[in-house]
Each structure stands twice: as C-alpha cells, then as structure tokens.
Amino acid sequence: MGNISRRNFLKYAGLTGGVAGLASLAGCSGNGGDGADGDKIKIGVSIWSSTDALGKLSVDIIKKAADILGVEITTVDQGHVSEQVTAPIETLCAAGCNGIVVCNSADSEMTAAINTCNDNQVYLAQFYRMISKENSPDVYSLAENSQYYIGAVHEDEVGNGEKLIELLTADNADAFEGIQKGARNIKLEAWTVGDATFQERWKGYKSGIEKWNAANPSDQATLSDPVYANTSSSEGANVTQQFYNTDNTMDALIVAGGGGDPLVGSVGQLKNMNLTGKIRVASTDFLDDLKDQLATGGMYCESGGHFCDPLYSFLMVYAACKGSETFMPKSGDFGKEIKFPYVFVSSVKEYEDYEKYFVDDAPYTDDEMKDLATKDFDALCTSAESLSIEDVKTRHA
C-alpha cells in the first residue's frame, strides 16, 4: 500500500460509524491479547463523531494504521453524551474486542468504562483526554489499580489556552487587514458542560489574561464567562449571535473546541452579520478551509494538527494486545501518559507550511507507522512529543 495523504484518508478508509459500526461488532472476537484462534486483533474506537473536521481525521489515521498492521477496527459515534459514551464500551467488550480507545467527555464516564474493561479483560486507553488526579481522585485511583487501563494521550491544554490568548492580544501585521490590532474584549464559546479538556483550556485562557493584564496595567483585556454550544454548528451560530447582540464592542471570539462544527457555525454567523474580518476568531481543531479563512479574516489564529493523538493511543493498545512489556498495565501504577504538541498558525504563510507537511502528505509514511508499532513506550513517547512541522521536514527531506 502506498503512502496516503490526509486529503485521501476519507476515500481510502471506508469509515464505519454509528449504527453501521455497531452492526459490524459481531466480527470481533478474542479478549486481552491476540485474537482467539489466530484471528486479527480487534480494537474498538469510541469517539464523539467520525464525520466532523477533527473526528474524521482522527478515525482516518487510526484506520490507516489498522490496515497497515492488520488490525480490525470498529468505530462508534457517541456524541459526548454520557450514557452514549459508556454504553458502547459495554457493547464493544461484549462483542469480544481486544482493546478500546475512547475520547470521553467527563472524567466520571471513565468509572464505568474502566470497570467494564476490567470485567471483560479488555485493554483501554484514552485520546484527547486525561483523568484529572486533582478533580477526580476516585476515578484516578480506579485507573491506577486497573490491570487493563493503559493510559492516555492528550495535549497540554493549559499551555494551549495561554498561547491562544497570547496570540489574540498581540498586534499582528501579517493578519488580515481588519484584525491586525490585538484584542481586548474576548468572548468564550465552549462546548459540553463539565468536559475535562475544556476545563483545562479554560484555565489556560484565564491564565493568559492574567499574564497580559499583569504586564499591561493600563491596557487591560477581559474574557467572558463561557457559553456552551455543545457540538453542533447551529448552536455555535446562536451563541455567537448572542454574544454580539449582548455586547457589540467584542473584538475577539474563542471557539474552544467541540470537534469543528461549532466553529463552522460561529464563522458562518459572523459572515451573515457582516463581521468577517472585524472580529478576531481563535479556536482549536483545524478546519478544512483554514487557509481561506485566514486569508479572508474569517479566522485569526488556530491551534491544531494534533490528529495523530488518537494514532498513538491506538498504538499503545495495539502494543498491549501484542504483549509488549512496557505497555502492560500494572496495578498501583496509573498508566502511561503521552502529552502531544499542538501546531499554532496565525497567518497564511504559517498555514502553508503546515499544509505542505501535514495535509498534502501524511506526517508518517507506511514504513514509519510500522516502525512506530515496534517501539517501546519511551521511544514511542519521544516520537509523539517531537512531532512538528520541522520534524516532518527532517524525516521526509
């Protein structure tokens, strides 16, 4: 199989999601290691959506790795609704999958997920999420004492939030003409109440505001309380209109996340209100048309490029299913943690570099993916943490 670009992932992958994903579960067999009777390893993927901008890329790259490694996967969309996050774990385990990767919403959902995997001897890892020891000590302790919870791959969300505030408040001569001046009245659109990742990003936004205000006592910036848009474009549009109707002096909007659809709605609503290129918009999760949005002022800056995060979660589960010693969970040890780096862009020029090395061509060739699957945890962690535009340039020179 040749190397596949992100642009061609979707056509290549033949994705299975939602009801179709559940229908294919009967093909799973064998627990806690290689498939029974010599069958393939089967790994379940529980994700909020396999069709929005980030969700699609996430499932596509797992599918690419699975095909290279001869693994069967089944994808279930759960919409970040708590009962829909936990129920598919039971279904995947009952069908006999060897491992599961999950993007949950709240830490509390991991209690049922871990217990179910413990009972069924199925390996479990998170992606885009990490159980908080501080906020969820009981859930953290449960994971710590599990022999099947492998760990988590996630991002430095506090640092992400701080960096986006730094970009929003700074002047930028390379930005679209109408939004070159730093923002001071920033509105915050969140997605799901209680989402663990949002809570960390919010800490970063608030920290970034505090740092700016401490350094600029005569030029203060403000950040609104969050208003929640869930994961739909229509609710994103409604929240954006609500912000502007309430305070038309706003000069920036952070769409904190939600997979991409809320951002699509917010950007579209600003266009409908003739505010494109007049209000800075920042977000996390790259849109398919980000280059055009940067060029026209629809977007000011964005963090993203982290769609390889679920790839590494998948590789950890795969390694555990294969019996690789450095990935095997041990009771009393919380598990493995990989902290994935973000890519930040705030100009067309910056995005063009990202596009060349992450979009037009995949950041990993087939041979490189095969090599990643042979690494021990420390080496795999190093590979993940070093992923950047410069890293891909070096490897693919």
Residue ranges of each PLM-predicted region?
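Flexible loop/hinge segments that line or gate small-molecule binding clefts
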Residues: 114-159, 179, 290-291
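Short, solvent-exposed amphipathic alpha-helices that sit
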Residues: 54-68, 160-164, 196-216, 265
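Hydrophobic alpha-helical segments within soluble ligand-binding/sensing domains
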Residues: 85, 145, 150-183, 236-237, ...
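Bacterial lipoprotein signal-peptidase II cleavage site
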Residues: 28-36
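Hydrophobic alpha-helical
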Residues: 100-119, 205, 225-292
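Hinge/cleft segment of the Venus flytrap/periplasmic-binding protein
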Residues: 39, 184, 189-193, 313-397
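N-terminal export signals
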Residues: 2, 8-28
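Extracytoplasmic "Venus flytrap"
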Residues: 41-61, 65, 74-86, 103-107, ...
